[in-house]
Amino acid sequence: MKLVIQVPCLNEEESLPATFADLPRSLPGIDTIEFLVIDDGSTDRTSEVARELGAHRVVRFPGRRGLARAFEAGLREALAMGADIIVNTDADNQYQGQDIGKLVAPIIERRADMVIGTRPIDQIEHFSPLKKFLQRLGSRVVRTLSQNDVPDATSGFRAYTREAALKLTVLTGFTYTLETLIQAGQKDIAITHVPIRTNGKLRESRLFRGMRAYIQRSLGTMFRVYVLYQPLRFFWSISSVFLIASAVLFARFVWIWIVTPGPPGHIQSVIVAGALAVIGFIVAVLGVIADLIAMNRRLTEEILLHVRSTRARDTSSREDPT
């Protein structure tokens, strides 16, 4: 069984030596371990340092594309290298490499296809109280959307089977952690989590410049991915609000018309009720159309899965003719 440990990097020449020194060279149940570095357009010697440290493969972008794109490129390259298991870790040595054995154990034992390393959020000293609260809140939202019980949704310390990696597609350009969890839940990928340890903080995060921007982009990612995979539920939920409001206003008009003698009044209630009903029906129809598009997308994903499997198999066969 072959394990590929991928490390997305951006200007990490100083932290890479500590990260590589912490990575395991052998593990029970694993025959081969190889290291893959994805250089996201670094302006320092990240790629050269990675090769000097013994990286088996270095993928370098000519310019910065973002963490999500680096992560997905790593998955595709790891598959081409013939990986049976892929572990993703950070280049800033945030996660302890000694825990990779714990991370891959559920996969080796065939208990999961995707394993998340759960950090002790409350014990991380450099996390502010606000950040700890938002981490817990965000994880709770993702658990609801993805229908899994992972307590640390933003952890980047993860292990994937070859089959899980083939199924995942990163659509947003911000961060992969939330999106892939929601995707995995929608695609029935077996997920579990294990407790892990963290190292001290080496530098500030390069993923976002402020908590507010991070929250906004994370919420946008979760919204887009949820609507992508649950369009009918989303649009019909909105439609039901308009239709219920329309029914209440129309019932109010009928009640007043029955109990009040003389010519009917409150015609404005009927007008507003009619407008709300039209909006509700339009939104419901949009939900049906979006659901049909989603069904077509699922068929496309099946074709993409077949193409990826064939391409990865052919590439790994050429690299390892034995």
Predicted regions and their residues:
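Short hydrophobic beta-strand elements that form part
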Residues: V4-P8, V37, R60
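Short beta-strand/loop segment that forms part of the nucleotide-sugar
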Residues: D31-G41
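Hydrophobic helical membrane-anchoring modules
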Residues: L171-T322
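Acceptor/aglycone-binding surface of glycosyltransferases and processive sugar-polymer synthases
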Residues: R57-A80, I85-V87, G97-F174, L178, ...
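Short, well-formed alpha-helical segments that are part of the catalytic scaffolds
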Residues: E12-L27
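Cell-envelope/extracellular polymer assembly enzymes that use nucleotide-activated donors
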Residues: K2-V4, E34, E179
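Residue-level preference for short helical/loop micro-motifs built around acidic side chains
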Residues: E14-A18, D44-E48, R57, R69, ...
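A conserved acidic beta->alpha catalytic loop
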Residues: D39-S47, N93
